[in-house]
C-alpha cells in the first residue's frame, strides 16, 4: 500500500511538472475562434520575469512597436509573447497599445506629393484643412519643417530630401481612424524605425541625414525594354536599336558609361497555339552598360518581328514582364525600370493559352516588391480600335504605383511616327536618369515637376520621366543614407496629400497593408485553393454542393462544417480566416453566397476563378520573398510577419 501511494505521488508530481512546462495559447479576441489578442510595445518597454518592475528583466532590448500576443492579464501588467507558442515575459500595460486588426501603413512614392507631416492632434490637422488659405499655409508649413522651425502642433515629418529607406522594415500601425471629410481619412498612427533606438539590440547607428542628399556612390540605373516582337512591330525594334546606340554614345561622352545599363526582353504569344512563333518570351540580353555595348548591340541586330500571326489580337505581354522581373540581374542596379512597348492588350484571364497566372494588379505588386517601376507604352493603331479600352485599363493597372499610372499611349496610323514617339519616351527616361546620376553626386536634387496638362506626346513623356526620376532619386537617397522612418509614438496624418486636397485632387500619402503571419498566409492560400477547386468542380459537373465542398475542405476554420449554406456568405460561414473580418475593404469573395455563384454565367464563373488564381500566385511569391519577412525576434516561422497590401486580399 505504501509503495502504491509513493508511485501515485510520483505520477502526480510528474503530471504537474509536465503541465507546468506546457505552454498555454494566447488569449482569444472576444467572439473569435482563431484570432488572438495582440498589443504593440512602446519605446522604453521591457519584459520582466514577473508582473513587477522589481523582478528580473528578461528582454531589455525589446524592439519598439513589436507586435505581442497576450497570454494573461494582471493588475496593470500583461503576460506576452512574440509568438503563439509561448509567453516571453510581463510588460507594463500602459506601455502597450491594443492592436487586434494588425493594420499598418506604407509611405507611397513621392513622385507627386509633399512629405507627410505628423500632427500632434486632430485639431491642428483640422485647422489646416478648414483654412480658407489652406494652400498658402501648407507652403509655409513645409518651409518651416525644412528649416526645423515648426510649432508644437507638428511632432515629425517624413524626410524632406529622400524617401524612407525601402530596405529597412518599419512599422506604422493604425491606432485610430476618423473620416471628417468624404473620401479623406485622419489616421492616428505610431511610427518608429526600430534600428534607430539607442541601446536597442537592433540599433544600427546614426545612419545618413536626410538634409544632406550627397552620397559618395553614384546611383546605377537599369532600364529593361520589354518589346512586343509580333507582326507589325519591326519599326519599334529598329528604333530601339538606334535609341540604345545613341544613348550609349552620349553616356560614354559624358563619362557615365557604367551608370546606365540596358536589357532587352522580347515576347510574342503561345507557341502551343502557333508553334511557328518560336517563343512566348525570351531574354535577348541581360543588362549591359556602354562599356560592353557590342554584346547587346550584336544581339539586338538579330531580333526580328514574327513571321506568322498569333492566335489572338492580344499578346502575352505579362509573360514578357514576368520574365524581365525574374530573369534579369536587377541586384546590380539602384533604380530599376521596365519599359513595356506593345500595340495590343495582355492575354485576358479566360484565354487558355495565357502562360502567367498573375493578372496586371498582382504583377504590379510583384514588380513593386522587387523595387521595379513599370512604364507602359501602349501604341494605339486603327487595327486595334476595339481593343484600346481593354488594353489601356490593363496597362494603367500594370504600371500603377500608389495611385499613379506610368502609362503613355501613342495614337498613330503610321508605324514610323509611332516609333518616333516611343523613342521620345525612352530618350526622356534615359536623360532623366543621367540627370539623377549627375545631380546626386553633386549633392543636388531634381525638381518635382508641376502638375500641368501636356500639349503633345513628347511633353507627356518628358513629364512622366521627370516624375519618375524625382521619385527614384528620393528612393536611392533613402537607401544610400539608410534614412529612417520618423520616430513618433502617437500622431495624426491624412491618408491623402494635403497640397492636392487643397486643389480638390486626391493623391495618396500612404498605402494600407495588413500584417499577416506566415501561418495566416498559408491558411489563406489553402482556403483560396479550396474555393478554386470546388468552383472548378461544380462548374464542370453542374453539381449544387459548391459551398458544402468548401466547408468540408475548410473544416478547421469554418464556424460549423454542417451549417446550412443557403443565404450565407463565405464570410458568415467562416471559410476565410477571421483575420479578414472587419478590414476596411470590400471583398468579392467574402460577400459571395452560393446563390450568387449559381447565378453567374460560365464566363463570369471562369473570370472569378482566374482572379483567385492570380491572388494565389501572388501569395506564393510572398512566401518566397525572404527579404521582406520580419521575425520580431521569434524563431517560429509561423509567427513571422509580412505587410500585405489590402488590394492583394481576396
Where are the predicted features?
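Von Willebrand factor
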Residues: 217-341, 346, 380, 384-387
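P/S/T/G-enriched low-complexity
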Residues: 365, 380-650
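Acidic, polar low-complexity linker/tail segments
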Residues: 166-224, 230-238, 250-253
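Bacterial N-terminal signal peptides
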Residues: 8-16
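SH3/SH3-like beta-barrel superfamily modules
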Residues: 58-94, 143-177
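Solvent-exposed loop/turn segments at secondary-structure junctions
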Residues: 76, 86-87, 97-98, 229-234, ...
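Loop/turn elements at helix/coil->beta-strand transitions in domains of secreted/extracellular proteins
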Residues: 221, 257-263, 330-338, 345, ...
